[in-house]
A protein has these predicted regions:
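Short secondary-structure boundary segments
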Residues: 9, 41, 112-114
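Acidic catalytic patch
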Residues: 42, 64-88
Length: 149
């Protein structure tokens, strides 16, 4: 069974826009289809909004290519079927990522958002690993935890 992975917007920027070397193994796994990367319309809309911002200087064509790539790697889940996680994030825009990981647990949410990372200990008790480490999904401890759940 492939590990279920939710990637927040900042991690997607590392993978698809910034070409961050720390994200290269994650990108390779996404390209190989060895992860069950999941998204919703709301998470796609947020990512599209962010990459469309002036600071990134991405042409419409480049934005379309990036979105096409992410959609080809990810499985789309309907926002309407998401369970509400018992932990709340102060940043309401990030709650959808938390709810998505909670719905599909055991799952990993990779995020650099400090508000999201604050709930990591509580989430882990319910089968959701929250980490800022791009490559924790490849660690033995994550594989063992998901196998136990």
């Amino acid at each position: 069974m492939k590990p279920v992975v939710v990637l927040d917007t900042n991690i997607l920027l590392d993978v698809l826009v910034f070409d961050d070397s720390r994200a290269h193994p994650l990108r390779a796994a996404l390209m190989a289809g060895s992860l069950d990367a999941v998204a919703t319309q709301k998470t796609l809309a947020e990512f599209l909004d962010v990459i469309g911002r002036q600071q990134f200087l991405l042409s419409q064509e480049k934005q379309d290519q990036i979105m096409f790539q992410w959609r080809s790697w990810s499985r789309l889940i309907n926002d309407e079927v998401l369970d509400i996680a018992p932990w709340k994030c102060k940043d309401r825009d990030d709650q959808v990522f938390i709810n998505l990981a909670y719905t599909l647990k055991p799952a990993m949410l990779i995020s650099k958002d400090k508000m999201v990372l604050k709930i990591a200990k509580r989430a882990q008790k319910d089968g959701v690993v929250i980490t800022s480490d791009h490559n924790r999904v490849f660690s033995d401890d994550f594989s063992l935890k998901t196998a136990e759940l």
